Amino acid sequence: MALWGGRFTQAADQRFKQFNDSLRFDYRLAEQDIVGSVAWSKALVTVGVLSADEQVQLEEALNNLLEEVRLNPQQILESDAEDIHSWVEGKLIDKVGQLGKKLHTGRSRNDQVATDLKLWCKDTIVELLSANRQLQNALVETAQNNQDAVMPGYTHLQRAQPVTFAHWSLAYVEMLARDESRLQDTLKRLDVSPLGSGALAGTAYEIDREQLAGWLGFASATRNSLDSVSDRDHVLELLSNASIGMVHLSRFAEDLIFFNSGEAGFVELSDRVTSGSSLMPQKKNPDALELIRGKCGRVQGALTGMMMTLKGLPLAYNKDMQEDKEGLFDALDTWLDCLHMGALVLDGIQVKRPRCQEAAQQGYANSTELADYLVAKGVPFREAHHIVGEAVVEAIRQGKPLEDLTLADLQKFSAVIGDDVYPILSLQSCLDKRAAKGGVSPKQVAQAIADAKSRLV
């Protein structure tokens, strides 16, 4: 069923119909389209287009259709309707006859689809926020269980300073918290209803659009009809949120892929999130994490594609905007799946503490402590930095960690070094000294865990 046709003397070419139709993807807006139609039927009563009895009939039929859709959304794809709006209207007419043809009075598919998509975005943000919280909680639990797991921290993928697996876990809690905040901000901006904006110039009926917005659960109605039907900022914002969120998940995945590798050996992933090789029986591949890392590109591609689609469009609605949905649906589905998978990866992960400790003791990660020790003895930092560099070269030559150099060896580089240097060079001392807010000291990490738990309640 097409919602247009009187102007045309020839039927559309079948190839054009297939090219033009959007039901194969916008069927996902069925529930939102029906909910919007119920609200619109109520608005039509207020302006005398529908009687109260007619509205009750329409609402009952629409609610029945909503239940049918929830039971079997795939039924929609069996239709040859042009789009979800055509499908819903056709089904409504099947149920109530000619009365169903009155529902579209004063409404355009332009404001209708804009409303549907915003309602869908609001629902999906709720799902994303829940999945984000689930992963944050999994990371906090991982941190709680691994406060004593000392490991090397890296810069340039070289061992830099000792940290703990708990501190590493909490770093990703911070990233996810920012993702959560961005989603909440986006929700505030998109929480305005375009319904009643018509095709572009507003509806010809004096509908109370603020009341209509309230019925649909929006905070308010939009202020300009031209902008209302052509605004896709919320699509761009959500794709941007997803792109940033997937960058965080990709980095999370990359870290764990490395930690799980034979070269690092810091963790072992559960069998539930790994796979084997068809040829090499010894392999246990981190496929879940590699897929998270790989899917980042498709999400960022959706953002780039949507920006290119919108950049040259004049006001108001253009058919180009039909391209807003497939990329958005796929990107947010992907982000949601990856958030769930990230939590699953952490469920059952084993941290190999002895190996983490061994790696932390290698790579001269306590070099900064020796420099700070020299500064405390009155040596200018830049000079101390140079002295420690020379000491590291000597330790490498001898094949020893810094703390195993003799006092005589260390005093070759600075006479101020005494026996009191050795406690300073221990891993525990390295951690304990980072006691400022946000640092890796056990006290600060414990406080960060407590703060995160309090925020996530």
Curated annotation (Swiss-Prot):
PROSITE patterns: FUMARATE_LYASES (PS00163). SUPFAM superfamilies: L-aspartase-like. One of its GO terms (biological process) is arginine biosynthetic process via ornithine. Its EC number is 4.3.2.1. Keywords: Amino-acid biosynthesis, Arginine biosynthesis, Cytoplasm, Lyase. GO terms for molecular function: argininosuccinate lyase activity. One of its GO terms (cellular component) is cytosol. Pathway: Amino-acid biosynthesis; L-arginine biosynthesis; L-arginine from L-ornithine and carbamoyl phosphate: step 3/3. CDD domains: Argininosuccinate_lyase (cd01359). It is found in: Cytoplasm. It holds the Pfam family ASL_C2. The keyword Glycoprotein does not apply. It catalyses: 2-(N(omega)-L-arginino)succinate = fumarate + L-arginine. Gene3D superfamilies: Fumarase/aspartase (C-terminal domain), Fumarase/aspartase (Central domain), Fumarase/aspartase (N-terminal domain). PANTHER family: ARGININOSUCCINATE LYASE (PTHR43814:SF1). This is Argininosuccinate lyase. It comes from Enterobacter sp. (strain 638). The gene is argH.
